[in-house]
Amino acid sequence: MCIRDRVYGPRRLRLRGGRLYGGIVITKHGHAQGPIGSLLIREAGHPVPDQDTFSATEEALALTDGLTAEDTVLFLLSGGGSALFEAPLVPQEELQSITQSLLASGADIVEMNTIRKRLSAVKGGRFAQHCAPAKVFSIVLSDIIGDPLDMIASGPAYPDSSTCADARRIAEQYGLRLSPEASQCLERETPKVLDNVETLITGSVRELCAAASAACRELGYEPVLLTDSLDCEAREAGAFLAAVARAHQDTERSLAFLAGGETVVHLTGSGLGGRNQELALSAAAGIAGLEDTAVFSLGSDGTDGPTDAAGGFVDGGTKERLARQGVRIFEVLKNNDAYHALAACGGLLHTGATGTNVNDVAVLLIRR
């Protein structure tokens, strides 16, 4: 959300200490919840930017044209902003193709955003440059492990720490097919210093893990936080949680092992699913036959991959139930089709849009 503090014709609102010149909110398709005062509300594509993304971003740039040192831009930023806030420096179709390639490559979010920054007129600190000399006060909800401010939503209002050399290495590592125009963009450095920006982090995966731990305790489980920086392959994370489950089968207490972060998926098939669903299904293979043992994993925003599910839930009987239907977990994972397998055994988790995004959480439950 971008708000400009002054007067904006008939859309004027009261703002303590000044006047609201105008504002715009950009969210995912289907996530708008009605009007917010006089702010413009726009829905756009995610995880791949679409024409609505580009149009909404143009409106935000127009709103912040011609600012002075007396103006302040209140910039509310969260995960998903890389897709929702975009003014490409390459043809739109190529940007969409590169984004899809990165999403399928197994690249982590830092690697993806390093490339995205250099293909954009608003990422990597360039939006703050556009707003200058106005002050940009950025309030950030972090969805990246370690809270790197230049990487969250690709850092529209923060100095960029990545380099052209980083971008070249990532493009080569993942075999990105780039036009000469896109290749030239990778050679253009992003702003390394911005003196008109102030930033505040208001939430992250640490708060998510703390809240999940408290909920587990209320349900009678003793919470054990394994990590709040989970960043491996989804299948590896599922196998790890299964190993933890087997190592603690002799416990006399009900335990909840939690892991927060964001895994990745390297697409090898043409199925449907998301990283949390794939993590859960991988865990199902490892906990097969264990009684009173379950694993669930979900995205805090209520969306896991290009599906309507937030994640997945499995227990010690999931593998057998799928086998009775002729479904083999290994084959499903190879085809990246966790969604349909979990749907077949009632293992999909649906929360709907939560209105926040602070990574994912996976939980192993052992009940005694």
Give names to the regions the model predicted:
Residues 1-5:
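Conserved small/polar residues in nucleotide/adenosyl-binding loops
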Residues 88-109, 160-175, 269-295:
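Gly/Ser/Thr-rich active-site loops/lids in small-molecule metabolic enzymes
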Residues 10-19, 38-40, 61, 88-101, ...:
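A glycine- and small-aliphatic-rich helix-loop capping segment at beta-alpha/alpha-beta transitions
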Residues 134-137, 159-240, 244, 249:
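Accessory alpha-helical/coil subdomains and C-terminal extensions
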Residues 62-151, 156-159, 334-337, 341, ...:
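Glycine-rich, mobile lid/loop segments that gate access to catalytic sites or pores
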Residues 220-297, 305-306:
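Active-site segments that bind and position negatively charged phosphate/pyrophosphate groups
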Residues 281-368:
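Internal helix-turn-beta structural module
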Residues 26-70, 111, 115-116:
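Glycine-rich oxoanion-binding loops at beta->alpha junctions
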